[in-house]
Amino acid sequence: MNFRSFVWFLGRPALYPELFRRLGRSLTTPRTPRSHREKQKILSADWCAGNACPREDFLRDVGFQGEWRKVSEIHPDIWRRAGEIAGSCPVRMGGAGEVDLLYHLCLHLQADRVVETGVAHGWSSLVILLALDRMGRGTLASTDMPYALRRNDRYIGCVVPENLRDRWKLIRLPDRDALPKVLREWPAIDLAHYDSDKSERGRAWGYRRLWSALRPGGFLISDDIHDNLAFRVFSEKIRRKPWVLPARGGAYVGILKK
């Protein structure tokens, strides 16, 4: 951690637990060599490519019977406005990801309690809340820690309109502080979307927490599983065969059903 990041954390007392964790890791845990990280990414990408299946196969396997349409077609005005807001945001925080999948899975599950980690502009939050609004039920709990030194605090979830926020609990804390709070209140959840700490350590911790809270039949979805072997290792540990779906830009999404 550099000095500027340290000062940034000092101005945010709610993030002190994360500051202490990072300082502790910097003192006790050797930094993983870049060569190791690159090797892990190659191995993971190869595994993803070898296990990938079309979206249609996944939908058939889980018994999806609804009409598949893009969220941008179902809610064109909301989607267009969200794009304008994200486009005018001075901080770049990533794209929309596999939002259509999230939307339709919420409807398929008739989800009542959904948890996501990582919000950024709020694209995934938006589609989940649109699905909950369509059903007239349910709540989304989202966890997100602002990027250090990026000044993005005020833009977290910016694409989510006010009329959808009644069903939304946004907790602006790191996963290790926010998820225990959420899961104490919700011991059982229907759907979990992981898109925050991409390190192997962070994913292993988050997957374990979310999986333990999922109800039987619920789904754990993780973006960018090609980055490292964390998703593969976790799926083997719990002895579940995952669905691996190709995503935009050569990425992969992993899905596990409890």
Regions found by a protein language model. Give the residues of each.
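Class I SAM-dependent transferase core
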Residues: 56-98, 104-109
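Short charge-dense sequence patches
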Residues: 43-58, 70-82, 154-161, 182-187
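Membrane-proximal basic amphipathic "stem/tether" segments
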Residues: 1-66, 70-73
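Residues that form generic nucleotide/phosphate-binding pockets
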Residues: 26, 46, 61, 81, ...
